[in-house]
Swiss-Prot record:
Signal peptide: none annotated. This is Sterol 24-C-methyltransferase erg-4. SUPFAM superfamilies: S-adenosyl-L-methionine-dependent methyltransferases. The lineage of its organism: Eukaryota, Fungi, Dikarya, Ascomycota, Pezizomycotina. Pathway: Steroid metabolism; ergosterol biosynthesis.
């Protein structure tokens, strides 16, 4: 089913040249701060300007439909520059798997992250030697884990050249380059032929689509008949009321802090799956499970939920005190020229997004893990 929204024209040469100027050889750095300090300042300023032009001086009270349409028209550029700015901060603060998860007693942070990935692979039924597509693969953390868990061959699709370089670097490092490959592309207009993959998954990535029918329709097209697609989707719950300014403020905070042009509700997400032709096998808000600790506890800095002393070094960075210290330090590094301009502004936007995520979760307005599993009919 073709997308009904205007698509951005792709220019891979332009994007590759920009990546080379902005990121240089930082894709091979250790990650996090080490990579962040290697950026080209002028190129980073371009990325900052291109991204924040959609959000600066925009409030929930004053936001118009035209504002949202302007973002969706440049959905690919908005997302690409968001990850030009945020990738190293993500790796520093969270790791190489850019998603949330559920937690169990006695389970460390990274064990929980891996279990969340395994659960999706099991729901889809990914098996050895299957040809699988990861839509919006980030730096390849989930692809590496699922490849090891299932022995499948996974292709990661990403519109950010820097993340593709990092994903490729990590795959080689881990001896997985025979199972993994990473491809540049816009998931609203994939270059793969029809019926190419045995299975497809997306982990908190298709939220960047300007219209879910567009990306789900492309997934349906490239999936083989009888194949299964599974997704952890970011959605506003059906408690969300767009006429409520507080609700809109929470949604806008999540969008600006996470590179999202147009987040929709659970009802709209389910409708999108059905509209493109998927037979829904299962759908569920995993955030509504009766878990002993909430999915958002790390970004809320709720240290009482730590299950391992090693988690402290990850989670302490998320506390409000640590954020203030780190963001102030980033500002100092910018001033003396050791960090590129826009580093603090980006970190502040991510912090605003984290606060929006927590507020949305506590008010039952948002979920980052609405599980949908759909099958493409044989006929």
């Amino acid at each position: 089913m073709p997308s009904t929204i205007a698509l951005e024209k792709e220019d891979h040469q332009r994007d590759a040249e920009f990546k080379k100027v902005m990121h240089g050889d930082s894709a091979k750095a250790a990650g996090g701060v080490a990579a962040l300090l290697k950026k080209n300042t002028e190129a980073q300023q371009i990325a900052v300007d291109e991204y924040f032009k959609h959000f600066d001086n925009k409030t929930a009270e004053a936001e118009t439909q035209a504002d949202r349409e302007a973002r969706t028209k440049e959905y690919a550029t908005l997302t690409r520059h968001y990850y030009n700015l945020a990738t190293d901060i993500y790796e520093y603060g969270w790791g190489q798997c850019f998603h949330f998860c559920r937690y169990s007693p006695g389970e460390s942070f990274y064990q929980a992250i891996a279990r969340h990935e395994h659960y999706l692979a099991a729901q889809i039924g990914i098996k050895k030697d299957m040809k699988v597509l990861d839509v919006g693969c980030g730096v390849g953390g989930p692809a590496r884990e699922i490849a090891k868990f299932t022995d499948a061959h996974i292709t990661g699709l990403n519109n950010n050249d820097y993340q593709i370089d990092r994903a490729t670097h990590y795959a080689v490092r881990d001896g997985l380059s025979g199972q993994l490959k990473f491809v540049k592309g816009d998931f609203m207009q994939m270059s793969f032929p029809d019926n190419s993959f045995d299975a497809v998954y997306a982990i908190e990535a298709t939220v960047h689509a300007p219209k879910l029918e567009g990306v789900y329709g492309e997934i349906y097209r490239v999936l083989k008949p009888g194949g299964t697609f599974g997704v952890y989707e970011w959605l506003m719950t059906d408690n969300y009321d767009n006429d409520n300014v507080e609700h809109r403020d929470i949604r806008l905070a999540i969008e600006v802090g996470n590179g999202i042009s147009n987040m929709v509700t659970i009802s709209e997400g389910l409708a999108a799956m059905k509209n493109v032709g998927f037979e829904l096998v299962h759908h569920e808000d995993l955030a509504d499970r009766n878990d002993p600790m909430p999915w958002y506890w790390p970004i809320a800095g709720e240290l009482r939920y730590m299950q391992s002393y090693l988690d402290f070094f990850t989670v302490v960075r998320m506390t409000h005190t640590a954020r203030r210290i780190l963001h102030g330090f980033a500002g100092i590094l910018e001033t003396v020229g050791l960090a590129p301009k826009g580093t603090k502004k980006t970190a502040d936007a991510l912090a605003r997004g984290a606060d929006g995520l927590v507020a949305g979760a506590k008010k039952k307005l948002f979920t980052p893990m609405y599980l949908m599993v759909g099958k493409k009919p044989l006929n």
